[in-house]
Every structure is written in structure tokens, then in C-alpha cells.
Amino acid sequence: MELEKNERINALFAFYQPLLTAKQNDYLQLYYADDYSLGEIATEFSVSRQAVYDNIKRTEKILEGYEQKLHLYAEFEARNQQADRIRDYVLSHYPTDQTLRDLIDGMENLEAK
């Protein structure tokens, strides 16, 4: 459960990072991406562990709020699932059609940007 939550927060952070303050960015980057402890972050910024914890929890709620309103991550996931289904279908029904493969690769490369 905790791993799923961490993965979700990291994904939301990737989508909505520009909307966060510098402090929110720093704390989440250190906590989730760089695996710092609350104490290490607190020491780094000369604040209490509780202040770091409160900021991280508040920022998690902000990220979830952005996702509830904008759905960027959910739509990204849906597009990726659909692209996977298309790729699987093409590979199983048209394995020698290089044009179809190239089109799918192009679509997937657009999504990766």
C-alpha cells in the first residue's frame, strides 16, 4: 500500500510540480525522490520534523486536489493503456506491417515528451 501511494505521489508530482511552491517542491523532491527522512529534511532547512511532515501532507492533498480537478494523470494512464492495447492488437494481427509499427512508435514517443 505504501509503495503504491509513493508511486502515485511521484506521478502526481511529475505532472503538477510547476504548480507548487519552491518549498513544496524541495520537500517532496527530497522525501519521495531522494528518500530523505523527515529529520534529514528538517535539518537541511532548519525547521522541525513536524513542520516538514505537515508541509508534505498538505502538499500531497494539494496534488490530489489538482488531479481531481484536472485529471492529467488519469488521462495519461488511460491513453497509455489504450496505446498498449493497440500495440498488442497490431503485433498479433499485423506482425509484418512496419508502417503500423512506426505509427504506434510515433504515438508513444509523443506521450513520452
From Swiss-Prot:
<dbReference type="Pfam" id="PF04297">
    <property type="entry name" value="UPF0122"/>
</dbReference>
<dbReference type="InterPro" id="IPR054831">
    <property type="entry name" value="UPF0122_fam_protein"/>
</dbReference>
<dbReference type="InterPro" id="IPR007394">
    <property type="entry name" value="UPF0122"/>
</dbReference>
<comment type="function">
    <text>Might take part in the signal recognition particle (SRP) pathway. This is inferred from the conservation of its genetic proximity to ftsY/ffh. May be a regulatory protein.</text>
</comment>
<comment type="similarity">
    <text>Belongs to the UPF0122 family.</text>
</comment>
<protein>
    <recommendedName>
        <fullName>UPF0122 protein LAF_1235</fullName>
    </recommendedName>
</protein>
<dbReference type="InterPro" id="IPR036388">
    <property type="entry name" value="WH-like_DNA-bd_sf"/>
</dbReference>
<dbReference type="InterPro" id="IPR013324">
    <property type="entry name" value="RNA_pol_sigma_r3/r4-like"/>
</dbReference>
